[in-house]
Amino acid sequence: MNSFLDIHNTDRSDLRGMIDSARRMKDARSGQPKGTPDADLPLKNRMVALIFEKPSTRTRVSFDLGVRQMGGQTMVLSGKEMQLGHGETIADTARVLSRYVDLIMIRTFEEATLLEMAEYASVPVINGLTNRTHPCQVMADVMTFEEHRGPIAGKKVVWSGDGNNVCCSMIHAAGQFGYDFTFTGPPTLDPEREALDFARAQGVQAVIERDPAKAVEGADLVVTDTWVSMHDPQSARERRHNQLRPYQVNEALMAHAKPDALFMHCLPAHRDDEATSAVMDGPNSVIFDEAENRLHAQKAIMRWCLGL
């Protein structure tokens, strides 16, 4: 039994195996209707709990569809239904769910909630997102890059904007997949130091460059994410926009990267804030391939967790 809690504490050979498995499964489904079951039905007779303390579109749809394509069934539970840690303890919830399901995916706020769920569950647990990390998204990002440009090892990846949870996982992935990483953004929104230290310890460059034009020089991939959350008050939104406006990914910024540099955004996006529509809809944008690949990457992760 394997839980998928983060990229940095998963063996790199297993991570590579998941990417390769995801690509094989995607290729095997080419041209088929979305509801067509996979030929081998690896999750036949399996039940998967999908816990959403934090709501989501892509995570819910991609995990739900992935389980169905592999022949399994899902039980979707919202934060209001679960009341994680408010009443019944997380530890007891994990123990109870383990009696009902074969696999748990949890999308939650606090990293501690994920870790406690994994500690007490007797079935594998998948990190669907926490405030600190978003490893499923970055596995899809690596898969997407390699579909379009070949091996990501040795490439230069630049993150522009807020050093958030996706950024943290992308730094972890730099260490595991062997690419160099540059962050450009305001000092108040730097990514966590521990992530940068981890990547450097694996022998790759993980640097901060305040000048966005210098940061993207020679980049093979430029990535950004939304500047604000749906829960942010208006005052915080305005402050963040003022901080981050110099780091908008636009055509002028992309001109400093390699001519064939890809652009990614995990979506949802606030168009013409963190990235312009010209970039998002441009020839080097792979944002919708990236969104689709959440499905395939997560199917591979589920198979790995269950040893299938």
Swiss-Prot record:
What does the record give as the organism's lineage? Bacteria, Pseudomonadati, Pseudomonadota, Alphaproteobacteria, Rhodobacterales
Compartments annotated for it: namely: Cytoplasm
Q: What is its EC number?
A: 2.1.3.3
Q: Which GO terms describe its cellular component?
A: cytoplasm
Task: Give the gene that encodes this protein.
Answer: argF
In terms of SUPFAM superfamilies, this protein maps to: Aspartate/ornithine carbamoyltransferase
Tagged with keyword Endoplasmic reticulum: no
Q: What catalytic activity is recorded?
A: carbamoyl phosphate + L-ornithine = L-citrulline + phosphate + H(+)
The region annotated as signal peptide is none
User: Has UniProt tagged this entry with the keyword Transcription regulation?
Assistant: no
**Where is this protein primarily located?**
cytoplasm
- One function term, GO molecular function aspect: ornithine carbamoyltransferase activity
Q: Which organism is it from?
A: Paracoccus denitrificans (strain Pd 1222)
| Residues that hold L-ornithine according to the record | 165, 225, 229-230
Q: Give the matching PROSITE patterns.
A: CARBAMOYLTRANSFERASE
Q: Name one GO biological process term.
A: citrulline biosynthetic process
**Task of the protein:** Reversibly catalyzes the transfer of the carbamoyl group from carbamoyl phosphate (CP) to the N(epsilon) atom of ornithine (ORN) to produce L-citrulline.
Q: Where does carbamoyl phosphate bind?
A: 56-59, 83, 107, 134-137, 266-267, 294
Q: Which UniProt keywords apply?
A: Amino-acid biosynthesis, Arginine biosynthesis, Cytoplasm, Transferase
Member of which family?
Belongs to the aspartate/ornithine carbamoyltransferase superfamily. OTCase family.
Question: Which pathway does UniProt place it in?
Answer: Amino-acid biosynthesis; L-arginine biosynthesis; L-arginine from L-ornithine and carbamoyl phosphate: step 1/3
A Pfam family matched in the record: OTCace
The protein's name in its UniProt record: Ornithine carbamoyltransferase
